[in-house]
């Protein structure tokens, strides 16, 4: 009769425990307003229909941004965007009450597309300009015009 012996080796596992501590500081994003929450008025006065070309009659948009606290998280960014009823011929222009006429917003001389956030520094805000634009081939009537848009600042 053969005898088979089993030798059991017990391995000893060592286990180390360590406590983990989590900590941080909760930061509330600042509440910011544009131009003290007042309507920004841009008056183009009399605009010659034949002179509307996307550069004539360009005017600076006078705006400011103020925030209720100076606390800033360096990982967060302030952005500026604008919205309104887009024209059917220019994605950087809002439509007006006259078909084929829009108001385009520009930043640094370039089209500022509607609903596109632009990272800004509140101490060095970009210059925004507004300019009338018209749809190619449209005959515009002689009439008063108006257009509406909303500037929005976000901090996230």
Regions found by a protein language model. Name each.
Residues 3-13:
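Sec-dependent N-terminal signal peptides
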Residues 2, 16-156:
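Mature extracellular/passenger domains of Gram-negative fimbrial/pilin and adhesin proteins
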């Amino acid at each position: 009769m053969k005898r088979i012996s089993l030798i059991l080796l017990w391995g000893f596992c060592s286990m180390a425990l360590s406590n983990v501590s989590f900590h941080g500081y909760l930061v509330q994003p600042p509440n910011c307003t544009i131009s003290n929450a007042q309507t920004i008025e841009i008056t183009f006065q009399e605009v010659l229909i034949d002179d509307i070309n996307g550069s004539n009659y360009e005017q600076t948009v006078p705006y400011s941004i103020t925030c209720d606290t100076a606390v800033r998280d360096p990982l967060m960014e302030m952005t500026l965007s604008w919205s309104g009823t887009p024209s059917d011929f220019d994605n950087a222009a809002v439509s007006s009450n006259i078909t084929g006429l829009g108001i385009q917003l520009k930043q640094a001389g370039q089209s500022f597309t509607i609903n596109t956030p632009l990272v800004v520094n509140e101490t060095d805000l970009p210059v925004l300009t507004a300019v009338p634009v018209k749809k190619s081939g449209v005959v515009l009537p002689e009439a008063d015009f108006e257009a509406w848009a909303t500037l929005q600042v976000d901090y996230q």
